Amino acid sequence: TISLNKLNMTQYEQFLTPENFKLAFVRLKTSSRNLYKTIYYEDLRIFGLYLDENIESTINQVKNEIYKPEKSHKIFIPKKDNLVRPLSILTFIDLLIYQAMTNVIADNSYDVIAPYYDNLIFGNIVNPSTANVLDREFFFKSWKRKWKRFNEVSKENFENGYKYLSEFDIASFFDTIDHNILCEILANTFKIEANILELLSKCLETWTADSNHKTFKSKHGIPQGPISSPFLADLYLFYVDTEIKKLNKKYDFKYSR
């Protein structure tokens, strides 16, 4: 059982608990098996052999400001449109710390974004801190259930007289997410504390860099591959959701993503 008593704890203190890092480890382990997970699967197994000791060591590195994120390695996956999708391969420690940070961000942002779940937002829905123990081991709720719900809502819209469907895709979305804007949204809308955001910003800037290009750094882009990234991308889009919801009062249309 992994539980986290948040009473009288700052978000940074929540982040640095062994319980949170164990939860991060379990969530990496329970994530869907895909190419990205295959790459770090052996690291998961080895780290788990001495899990408590390795987590304690990792937390101490962060507490004592010894921890430094490392530049990612990039691999490129062909897409159907003849373009490529870049995957950012992080070290396992970086990946674990990223997930541990995102656990805290997810728990502390949930009450703000939850009213949009199953209403406007149907993908990448996180399990809240109030979920049962087994569900909490998974970062996201079952995508199959959410896909079913999305199709049900779409069908209802057509049955209610809406005739036209427009689909949009943001080109190179992950690569163009501005770190400063992301941190402003996390701070102002979701009340994430400054020291969490400082570490997140430092990590994202480093991971955006490519190990093959020693001097290149960027203030935009989040790593594709880790399960933390689509959740942060959803929080980044939250402003769009709220603005479109305002337009919905003036124009008769339905919006979902």
Question: Where does each model-flagged region fall?
Answer:
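Conserved pre-motif C helix in the palm subdomain of viral-like polymerases
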Residues: 84-120, 174, 219-247
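Short, flexible active-site-proximal loops enriched in glycine and acidic residues
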Residues: 67-73, 111-117, 253
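Active-site-proximal segment of RNA-dependent polymerases
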Residues: 107-167, 172-178
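Catalytic micro-motifs at enzyme active sites that drive phosphoryl/nucleotidyl and oxygen chemistry
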Residues: 63, 72-76, 84-90, 148-158, ...
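Conserved polymerase palm-domain catalytic core
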Residues: 151-257
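Non-catalytic, polymerase-adjacent accessory regions of viral genome-replication enzymes
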Residues: 2-80
